[in-house]
């Protein structure tokens, strides 16, 4: 606890033990370790000490006046071997066998071109060496750069020998230097592909260049064989894409005529008047056929209602007008309203349908009246009952009314059925009651009069109503 009382609080800042000022800068302290500075004690070291020391003299030169502009030391580095540019079309056309005298002259021209190219290469290598010495990047980088550039020059001289007639000698020195530095792997592959395609188009029937003559002769024989096969019309199983030039269809060997008959086809059908397999057309095509028919399904599909021989069209017989009788032709509707009909069965009300309810009055002498109701949509008959004098109507709720009648459409064919009608508005119920009371005294038919008119046993009681 005592230490904590003597401890300096954290909020107090650290201060100097002595106050320094301009008059007392702190140099006149009485410390034992310090001693006054003595003047005149700095002397030159002895010769023995100087002999043991290593004196290094630094020479500074002005690089701004003598040094050339900085260049990229990695400009001459190439990761792929150099190849000569693609030969011109004129050189490709003159690739025919030459006589012995012409070959000797050509060899002399090539040797001269090689010498001139070597001279240019040496001058370029000297310039590159001079630039590499001036660089401060290190001796190792300049040595590697020189080796890589020398290798590229040798490859370039070998490639020049394969050029026809010394065509590359006529190029300028700047073009050769630029091509040597900027050549990449993609250019090499492109040159090889162009050479292969040009040899294939020409048929490979001549010997080109001094080196690889046997291989070129072999390719010429293969090209002649392929041309004979295509002229004879022989259809192979699957032809190689390499054997066809860009102007030919690569799919020619798949189905004899390929896609020449139509743009899209399934199967082959002989053309009219043809005997061989060379003129065939598609039986199912989306393009134009050879014989001029533009049928969607080819010339084989000839089923049509119209025949070409008779040029007559078979028309379907027209349907006869049939009169539809509903049985209401000699009747007049005294009441019409939309309602929902229910029937009392097995101690409960079951819905029988929704539709238009009519009270029809016959226009004949008997003036018979009946109830007719048909469902909406299909006009199915759901109620057909004649009115009788003893018919009683009972009110249900505010919008409904119930009664007993003989419904010819009901499942219970013998006796009366207890029905109920529900309308949208109470006023419609009163109107319906008035129409029934007015026309129920009409005389029913003989069959309906003979039926016993009594309350059915399954009729609901007054409490249920």
From Swiss-Prot:
Keywords: Acetylation, mRNA transport, Nuclear pore complex, Nucleus, Phosphoprotein, Protein transport, Repeat, Translocation, Transport. It comes from the Eukaryota. The modification Phosphoserine is found at residues 125, 459. It is found in: Nucleus, Nucleoplasm; Nucleus, Nuclear pore complex. Residues 1-44, 59-244, 308-330, 439-465 are annotated as: Disordered. The keyword Protein transport applies. Residues 266-298 are annotated as: 3 X 2 AA repeats of F-G. The modification Phosphothreonine is found at residue 455. Sequence repeats lie at residues 266-267, 286-287, 297-298. Residues 81-97 have a biased composition (Low complexity). Probably involved in nucleocytoplasmic transport via its interactions with importins and Ran, rather than by forming part of the nuclear pore complex (NPC) scaffolding. Part of the nuclear pore complex (NPC). The NPC has an eight-fold symmetrical structure comprising a central transport channel and two rings, the cytoplasmic and nuclear rings, to which eight filaments are attached. The cytoplasmic filaments have loose ends, while the nuclear filaments are joined in a distal ring, forming a nuclear basket. NPCs are highly dynamic in configuration and composition, and can be devided in 3 subcomplexes, the NUP62 subcomplex, the NUP107-160 subcomplex and the NUP93 subcomplex, containing approximately 30 different nucleoporin proteins. This is Nuclear pore complex protein NUP50B. The gene is NUP50B.
């Amino acid at each position: 606890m005592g230490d904590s009382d003597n401890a300096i609080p954290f909020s107090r800042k650290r201060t100097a033990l002595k106050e320094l000022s301009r008059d007392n800068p702190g140099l006149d302290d009485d410390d034992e370790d310090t001693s006054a500075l003595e003047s005149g004690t700095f002397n030159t070291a002895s010769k023995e000490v100087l002999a043991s020391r290593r004196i290094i003299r630094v020479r500074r030169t002005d690089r701004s006046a003598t040094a050339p502009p900085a260049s990229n030391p990695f400009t001459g580095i190439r990761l792929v071997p150099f190849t000569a540019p693609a030969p011109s079309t004129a050189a490709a056309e003159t690739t025919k066998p030459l006589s012995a005298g012409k070959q000797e002259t050509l060899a002399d021209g090539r040797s001269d071109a090689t010498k001139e190219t070597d001279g240019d290469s040496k001058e370029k290598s000297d310039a590159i060496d001079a630039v590499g010495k001036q660089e401060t990047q290190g001796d190792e980088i300049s040595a590697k750069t020189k080796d890589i550039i020398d290798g590229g020059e040798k490859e370039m001289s070998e490639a020049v020998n394969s050029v026809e007639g010394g065509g590359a000698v006529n190029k300028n020195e700047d073009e050769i230097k630029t091509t040597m530095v900027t050549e990449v792997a993609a250019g090499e592959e492109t040159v090889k592909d162009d050479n292969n395609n040009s040899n294939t188009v020409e048929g490979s029937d001549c010997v080109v260049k001094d080196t690889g003559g046997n291989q070129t002769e072999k390719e010429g024989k293969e090209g002649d064989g392929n041309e004979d096969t295509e002229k004879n019309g022989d259809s192979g199983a699957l032809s190689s894409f390499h054997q066809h030039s860009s102007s030919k269809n690569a799919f020619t060997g798949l189905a004899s005529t390929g896609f020449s008959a139509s743009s899209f086809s399934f199967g082959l059908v002989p053309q009219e008047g043809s005997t061989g397999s060379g003129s065939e057309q598609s039986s199912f095509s989306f393009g134009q056929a050879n014989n001029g028919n533009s049928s969607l399904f080819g010339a084989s599909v000839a089923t049509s209602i119209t025949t070409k021989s008779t040029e007559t069209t078979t028309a379907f017989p027209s349907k006869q007008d049939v009169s539809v009788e509903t049985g209401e032709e000699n009747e007049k509707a005294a009441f019409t309203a939309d309602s929902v009909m229910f029937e009392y069965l097995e101690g409960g009300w079951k819905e029988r349908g929704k539709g238009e309810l009519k009270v029809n009055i016959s226009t004949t002498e008997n003036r018979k009246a009946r109830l007719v109701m048909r469902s909406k949509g299909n006009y199915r008959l759901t109620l057909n009952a004649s009115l009788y004098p003893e018919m009683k109507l009972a009110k249900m709720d505010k919008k409904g009314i119930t009664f007993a009648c003989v419904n010819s459409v009901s499942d219970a064919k013998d006796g009366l059925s207890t029905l109920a009608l529900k309308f949208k508005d109470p006023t419609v119920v009163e109107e319906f009651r008035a129409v029934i009371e007015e026309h129920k005294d009409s005389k029913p038919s003989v069959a309906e009069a003979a039926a016993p008119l009594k309350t059915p046993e399954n009729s609901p009681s007054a409490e249920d109503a």
